[in-house]
Amino acid sequence: MKKNNIIYWTTTGLFSAMMLFSASMYFTSPEVQANFTKMGFQDAFRIELGIAKIIGALVLLIPFLKGSVKEWAYAGFGITLISASILHASVGDPIANSITPLIFLGILVVSHIFWKKLLKATV
């Protein structure tokens, strides 16, 4: 149980920190803003995605939130990360830009697996 707890909080904390950092860059970095424009997105999408990442990261971090709220956060992040990987590949970005979201998807999957294990242990 303790090992599962450590793995869950380590992966969830790392993932959430990266999503919060990413969201902050959406609001503060002219380079990130230019990249969204280059990929054909309107500015409102960048802001919406930044807000969604902040909310999702907080949902993952708040311990007393259980059930479908966390499931939706996990699903939303999964879709976002897969989409980011495909998008970076389709616009000809360096391969690292396509692989990075998949690495974080792996961290997200580990977090989800251990969240489920912790839920089963408390039932």
Please provide the spans of the model-predicted regions.
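Membrane-interface extramembranous regions
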Residues: 1-123
